[in-house]
Amino acid sequence: MSTLVVLGTQWGDEGKGKVIHYLAKQADYIVRYQGGNNAGHTLIHENKPFILHLIPSGILFPDKYCLITNGVVVDPKALKEEIAILDKNNISVEKRFFISEQAHIILPYHKLIDGILEEENVKIGTTRRGIGPAYADKVKRIGIRVVDYLEKDVFEDLLEKNLIEKTPILKNSGVDIANLKEEILKDREELSIFLEPFVTDTSIMIANAIKKNKKILFESAQGTMLDLDFGTYPFVTSSNPIAGGVCSGAGVGPTKIDSVLGVVKAYTTRVGEGPFTVELFDEMGKFLREKGAEYGATTGRPRRCGWFDAVVVRHSVRLSGIKHLILTKLDCVEDIDKIKICVAYKYKDKLYKEFPASRTVQKYAEPVYEEMPGFKGKVKGIIDFEKLPLNAQKYVKRLEQLVDAPIDLISLGRKREETIEVRKGVNWF
């Protein structure tokens, strides 16, 4: 085994950053295959907190190659700022960080349009960082790729065409098109020089690494329930975080993916708008938010909190062929008298054990709960599964049964060492 996909099984914020940081030591390459700087990974490295938005978490290890592939949309300014922060912490990216020449560029007008559309249309809860509009341009075949951005004449021609196409919506919101164009051209002079050393054909890099049996970790952003096709549409992201997204988002054939690992929180959270069947509006919801420090790494927005939703996680396990699960934040459900698990949805006397596509059912369905006794005492610091409180062990085993996948690791904090190997000696690669 040499390739492993790590993805979120809920609405993002499952703790993928810590998990990827934990596994990255065993990998040679860490590859980000979709999304943009709308996602934030928070992790602790050598007792320092880091929040990464674009660069794969493996960059904190000096001997790892980190790739941003064609399925990602790249904001050059945001990337430069992120690298500057790493430089300040004496973490060099030179000769080990690469960007696909076919990745699409986020430009200032994408961010402006993102904000305009969020105000005018149904609120999706975007981060207003231009992700959706950049992907929209890609689909409309007017997008500007990294390779285009580096070629001055090509870029200027494409920019002109894009500004003509976007003039009505921008002018209507009071944007000075001439000033915007001048700003973009001026920024490009500096940013193209900054980008150029990192640009390559990442698909070929990955293919060559696979031939050499290198260990490759594919890192998703967001989570399955934000997937453009299989999430709570239209309250989704603009790309495919599921395992299938690796094939188109990194240029990797499906037969080259050896295993898929899902990251799942011991309860459920969601940021922004959209249906959320298990959402808690009471003191328990507040308890989970504060206990789990549930505030967005990118936006700082408070996350909506609820009980574990087995319908959602089982949906994710099936869609991505997940072979292993890592359970995070088990410590955040300690000291609760009774823990609930959503095992189905109910709408108009019909029971749904699989996740429904209907917007109406998603919005109005009631959760069907199974109740278990909670567990008391601090679980942080425990490194053996058998030493967890008996009710904590029962909770973990019940989750495995309900979602049809084994939980092989349990995370009890942000540090790498705050991890329990449930099944010893699992060969991740």
From Swiss-Prot:
Keyword annotations of the record: Cytoplasm, GTP-binding, Ligase, Magnesium, Metal-binding, Nucleotide-binding, Purine biosynthesis
Organism encoding this protein: Endomicrobium trichonymphae
Chain residues that bind Mg(2+): D13, G40
UniProt gene name: purA
Catalytic activity: IMP + L-aspartate + GTP = N(6)-(1,2-dicarboxyethyl)-AMP + GDP + phosphate + 2 H(+)
Active site: D13 (proton acceptor), H41 (proton donor)
Cofactor(s) the protein requires to work: Mg(2+)
Keyword Magnesium: yes
Annotated family: Belongs to the adenylosuccinate synthetase family.
Domain of life (superkingdom): Bacteria
Functional pathway: Purine metabolism; AMP biosynthesis via de novo pathway; AMP from IMP: step 1/2
Gene3D superfamilies the record matches: Adenylosuccinate Synthetase, subunit A, domain 1, Adenylosuccinate Synthetase, subunit A, domain 2, Adenylosuccinate Synthetase, subunit A, domain 3
CDD domains to which the protein is assigned, alphabetical: AdSS
Function: Plays an important role in the de novo pathway of purine nucleotide biosynthesis. Catalyzes the first committed step in the biosynthesis of AMP from IMP.
This protein's name: Adenylosuccinate synthetase
PROSITE patterns for this protein: ADENYLOSUCCIN_SYN_1, ADENYLOSUCCIN_SYN_2
GO cellular component: cytoplasm
Residues involved in substrate binding: A297, T298, T299, G300, R301, P302, R303
Residues at which GTP binds: 12-18, 40-42, 303, 329-331, 411-413
Compartmental location: Cytoplasm
SMART domains the UniProt entry points to: Adenylsucc_synt (SM00788)
GO biological process entries: 'de novo' AMP biosynthetic process; IMP metabolic process
Note describing how the cofactor binds: Binds 1 Mg(2+) ion per subunit.
Binding-site list for IMP: D13, E14, G15, K16, N38, A39, G40, H41, T127, R141, Q222, T237, R301
Keyword Nucleotide-binding in annotation: yes
E.C. designation(s): 6.3.4.4
GO molecular function annotation: adenylosuccinate synthase activity; GTP binding; magnesium ion binding
Oligomer and partners: Homodimer.
